[in-house]
Design a protein with these regions (language model features):
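Acidic, low-complexity cytosolic segments
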Residues: 1-8, 20-170
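Short, acidic, Ser/Thr-enriched surface-loop or helix-capping motifs
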Residues: 14
Length: 170
């Protein structure tokens, strides 16, 4: 990946639009700003996914179909979106630069983040202790801040460092 990319934040959002994990990689009091960016990105993602025709089974296997491109820019941040086939939304905020950001580089970041999430959820030893009430809300996934999700957060932090994040906030 080119060194000019700098990842400022990553957000994982459930299909019901509940934040699973919002991780910031900038120093300072900008954490609330990235929560705002994640929530406003949901409106753009919902609008784009509602306007697109439903995918056929043959087309839905492509990871590029999950990539939602540049959602918007705000101040010094470019926001990109990705929606998994199970409707989990991954949002990244990259620092704006004068350099060209290639879609292939952004898609590589999303594939890595999606793989980390998929591996964490598929861990058979991760007991989420969610009540079985028939409701299809992934409420147990909202506990990503709990110690059970330490490996998930660590892997997301590793991706942030590999992309070029400055520092990791707790």
């Amino acid at each position: 990946m080119p060194p000019q990319l700098r990842l400022n934040a990553v957000a994982f959002v459930s299909p019901q639009n509940h934040p699973i994990l919002i991780r910031t990689f900038v120093q300072g009091p900008d954490e609330l700003k990235y929560h705002y960016i994640a929530h406003t990105s949901l409106d753009v993602i919902d609008e784009r996914s509602a306007s697109e025709p439903p995918l056929t089974a043959a087309m839905s296997s492509k990871s590029t179909e999950c990539y939602m491109n540049l959602l918007y820019t705000m101040e010094d941040v470019a926001v990109y979106g990705y929606m998994t086939p199970l409707k989990v939304k991954i949002i990244i905020a990259l620092a704006l630069t004068d350099a060209v950001v290639r879609d292939a580089d952004v898609l590589t970041i999303f594939k890595a983040l999606h793989t980390v999430y998929r591996q964490s959820v598929a861990n058979p030893f991760l007991r989420l202790s969610a009540p079985i009430d028939g409701y299809n809300d992934n409420a147990a996934l909202l506990a990503a801040g709990s110690p059970k999700w330490k490996a998930f957060r660590r892997r997301v932090d590793d991706i942030g460092k590999a992309v070029g994040a400055v520092a990791v906030t707790a």
